[in-house]
């Protein structure tokens, strides 16, 4: 198959943006009733509902004695994991931990000679729930990316949920990654029922303060539904890559990077925006060549048919404009002056600069988080970070002398808003002086 090559203009841009928005989890209202039923059932029946849904959807029979992963199961997992993979998991964990450690914030206080103390107190969340997908694809990298920022932030307790196989077991790779990352408890439950258990609590699974981690449409809608009852990270949509390139880019590298995202699922988007017609055709040819060698060629072909684009722009300014409008989850810059282009990018989840910063480098190993905003939400959301696992409390302390100097100003403000009890709360401290 050949990727479609189109001239970038107002019509093609409009059609592209409309196509991408169709992939949003907000457009799956037909699933909401099913999700609500699951949430309500778990809220009411707790463990019994969790066990029933796990049997129905995953084919695994769980009890209060088997829902939590045991130390023996973790030891068994280590025996099954390849030594090379274990070494790589540990290296990646160190990189992720080192990167996120730089995001730490300290509490601060600003004191004045007049007795005024203002500040901000940083407090880690108490308990966090991490959702890790299961099924055919197993993602130990997602375990590390969700857990390490929470560990760096100082979260007291990290609970992980992940769906079991029909044998009632969890992938060894997932268990080993969880142990290496420092997860405190692991439960064999997935889907909307897992989100409900974390949000409301059951006899076996404790209620958490925040839920993070990607999942299918049922998980996404369940997270959306419990938001406000608990905090969540974001509503993850299908994966996206946008490559910005000029005539200096290597077409083989660009094609390989586009395919690396198209293989996720049929809703994934892979887009090249370039000023070079020669590169556009070469990339399309390279995609055809690679497809013959790849194990997920059928998924990739459907993904590219639906959401694969090569757009030809007149100028690099046009390329940058459309990149900022798309606000892609992953943005690669393969141009003559990539850092110069980077300074003009306002909207992107993660920015990969230069031809050797391939997107999978960020997925697995470099250190920055791979939990990124999708569906254009990079215009206002950020990657998962240490900030997602802390709270900030304002600190205010005034001496009598400090308050005395401003109390009439405060009273005037309160009276202007007709909040006389507010004014009185200040006035009563100085009423003997008036």
Question: What would you call each of these model-derived segments?
Answer:
Residues 325-434:
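C-terminal core of ALDH-fold dehydrogenases
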Residues 145-156, 179-181, 199-205, 223-225, ...:
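Alpha-helix C-terminal capping segments
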Residues 110-176:
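Conserved small-residue-rich beta-alpha loop and adjacent elements
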Residues 182-253, 257-260, 264-269:
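Conserved NAD(P)+-binding/catalytic subdomain of aldehyde/semialdehyde dehydrogenases
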Residues 212-214, 234-245, 261-284, 300-311, ...:
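Short loop-to-beta-strand entry elements in the cores of soluble alpha/beta enzymes
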Residues 156-166, 270-276, 354:
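Short internal beta-strands
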Residues 1-126:
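N-terminal Rossmann-like NAD(P)+-binding subdomain of aldehyde/semialdehyde dehydrogenases
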């Amino acid at each position: 198959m050949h990727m479609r090559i189109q001239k970038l203009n107002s019509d093609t841009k409009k059609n592209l943006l409309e196509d991408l928005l169709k992939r949003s989890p907000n457009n799956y209202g037909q699933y909401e009733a099913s999700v609500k039923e699951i949430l309500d059932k778990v809220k009411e029946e707790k463990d019994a509902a969790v066990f029933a849904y796990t049997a129905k959807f995953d084919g695994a029979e769980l009890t209060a004695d088997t829902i939590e992963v045991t130390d023996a199961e973790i030891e068994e997992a280590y025996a099954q994991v390849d030594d090379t993979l274990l070494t790589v998991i540990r290296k990646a964990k160190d990189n992720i931990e080192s990167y996120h450690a730089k995001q730490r914030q300290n509490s601060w206080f600003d004191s004045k000679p007049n007795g005024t103390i203002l500040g901000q107190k940083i407090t880690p969340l108490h308990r966090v729930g991490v959702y890790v997908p299961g099924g055919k694809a197993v993602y130990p990298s997602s375990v590390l990316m969700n857990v390490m920022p929470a560990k760096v932030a100082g979260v007291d307790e990290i609970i992980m949920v992940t769906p079991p196989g029909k044998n009632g077991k969890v992938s060894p790779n997932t268990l080993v990654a969880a142990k290496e990352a420092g997860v405190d408890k692991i439960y064999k439950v997935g889907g909307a029922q897992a989100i409900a258990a974390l949000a409301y609590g059951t006899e076996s699974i404790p209620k958490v303060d925040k839920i993070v981690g990607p999942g299918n449409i049922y998980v996404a809608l369940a997270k959306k539904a419990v938001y406000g009852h608990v905090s969540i990270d974001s509503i993850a949509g299908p994966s996206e890559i946008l490559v910005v390139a000029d005539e200096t880019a290597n077409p083989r590298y660009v094609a390989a990077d586009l395919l690396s995202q198209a293989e996720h699922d049929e809703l994934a988007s892979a887009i090249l925006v370039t000023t070079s017609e020669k590169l556009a055709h070469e990339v399309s040819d390279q995609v055809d060549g690679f497809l013959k060698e790849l194990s997920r060629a059928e998924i990739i072909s459907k993904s590219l048919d639906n959401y694969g684009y090569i757009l030809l722009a007149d100028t690099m300014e046009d390329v940058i404009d459309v990149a900022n409008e798309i606000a892609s989850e992953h943005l690669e810059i393969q141009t003559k002056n990539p850092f110069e282009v980077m300074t003009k990018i306002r909207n992107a989840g993660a920015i990969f600069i230069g031809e050797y910063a391939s997107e999978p480098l960020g997925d697995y190993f470099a250190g920055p988080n791979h939990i990124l905003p999708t569906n254009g939400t990079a215009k206002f959301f950020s990657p998962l970070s240490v900030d997602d696992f802390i709270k900030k409390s304002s600190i205010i302390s005034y001496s009598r002398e400090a308050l005395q100097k401003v109390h009439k100003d405060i009273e005037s403000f309160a009276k202007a808003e007709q909040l006389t009890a507010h004014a009185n709360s200040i006035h009563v401290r100085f009423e003997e002086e008036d």
